[in-house]
């Protein structure tokens, strides 16, 4: 089926979907967090403070009215427990202060807290954009993810986890999910706390007609974006068994598919490539990664119908 990734109308807006202020365990005030991202040219952010009783269940929305900058209310929610006994972490963007908190006092396991199936479903039903977070850092397994049927995305890159403990990737868990047959988009984030230099390393580029909370959330839910550490996608087309990629200058363009399937084009300062999709398992999934000469990557959301 013919497919064009960025065919919706609008412009690309740059945003961070995961970060913290001193309303939970971050260093900066919400206003200072916003100003830091504004200075780096971001168009929107969500401050996702830890939604725990010890922090009074914050949904952080600074009283800032800044032209051309959007702040999306959100939180990082927690409940017990993952297969390895770790606490669940779940992003929810577009959350309002009427959302009933789970019974989770702090970062310790609470066996009486709400299960992840119920929490993720309530968030989804409340209209939030829901994402699984840092799967490599907290040892998430495929079995864990099968408990969640109401999520939009998973972090493919978490900058804070990458620089603090070299556990910032979500690729392995993502591909297991896709191989299993579940559909899930991806996001790159900072998870910034500003105690160290953990900001401005992973973001999303969302295509939308306007930069507003409602429009950005709708575009996220519809998958009208890509994730990046630096490189940019210009366009991606699928037609008659061919995939065409247009991008900023990079060193590698990689198409990954079911199992171990992949196709790669390597060339200095390459800005386009055409791939024969007959080399990939049909009617499964594919996704595209580009890597620049600094090793920075950008990722598309998975394509399922090709």
Model-derived features: positions:
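Hydrophobic, Leu/Ile/Phe/Ala-enriched alpha-helical segments that form helix-helix packing faces
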Residues: 123-124, 177-178, 220
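Generic, low-specificity signal for short hydrophobic/alpha-helical stretches with a mild N-terminal bias
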Residues: 18-19, 136, 156, 198, ...
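Short alpha-helix boundary/capping motifs
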Residues: 65-66, 151, 205-208
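Glycoside hydrolase catalytic-domain groove-lining segments
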Residues: 172-183
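A metal-dependent hydrolase metal-coordination microenvironment
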Residues: 2-129, 133, 140, 147-149, ...
């Amino acid at each position: 089926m013919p497919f064009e990734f960025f065919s919706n109308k609008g412009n690309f807006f740059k945003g961070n979907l995961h970060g913290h202020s001193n309303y939970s365990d971050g260093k900066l005030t919400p206003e200072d967090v916003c100003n830091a991202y504004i200075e780096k040219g971001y168009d929107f952010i969500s401050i996702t403070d830890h939604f725990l009783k010890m922090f009074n269940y914050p949904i952080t929305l600074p009283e800032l009215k800044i032209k051309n900058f959007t702040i999306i209310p959100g939180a990082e929610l927690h409940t017990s427990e993952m297969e390895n006994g770790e606490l669940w972490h779940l992003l929810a963007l577009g959350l309002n202060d009427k959302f009933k908190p789970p019974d989770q006092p702090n970062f310790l396991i609470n066996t009486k807290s709400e299960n992840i199936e119920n929490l993720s479903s309530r968030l989804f039903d409340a209209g939030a954009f829901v994402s699984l977070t840092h799967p490599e850092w907290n040892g998430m397994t495929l079995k864990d993810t099968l408990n969640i049927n109401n999520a939009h995305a998973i972090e493919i890159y978490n900058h804070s986890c990458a620089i603090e403990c070299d556990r910032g990737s979500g690729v392995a868990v993502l591909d297991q999910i896709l191989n299993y047959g579940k559909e899930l988009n991806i996001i790159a984030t900072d998870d910034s706390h500003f105690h160290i230099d953990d900001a401005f390393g992973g973001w999303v580029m969302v295509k939308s007609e306007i930069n507003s909370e409602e429009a950005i959330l709708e575009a996220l839910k519809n998958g009208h974006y890509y994730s990046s550490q630096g490189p940019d996608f210009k366009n991606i087309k699928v037609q008659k068994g061919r995939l065409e990629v247009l991008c900023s200058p990079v060193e590698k363009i990689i198409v990954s598919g079911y199992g171990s399937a992949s196709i790669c084009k390597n060339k200095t300062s390459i800005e386009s490539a055409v791939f024969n999709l007959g080399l990939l398992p049909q009617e499964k999934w594919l996704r595209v990664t580009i890597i620049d000469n600094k090793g920075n990557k950008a990722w598309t959301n998975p394509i399922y119908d090709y």
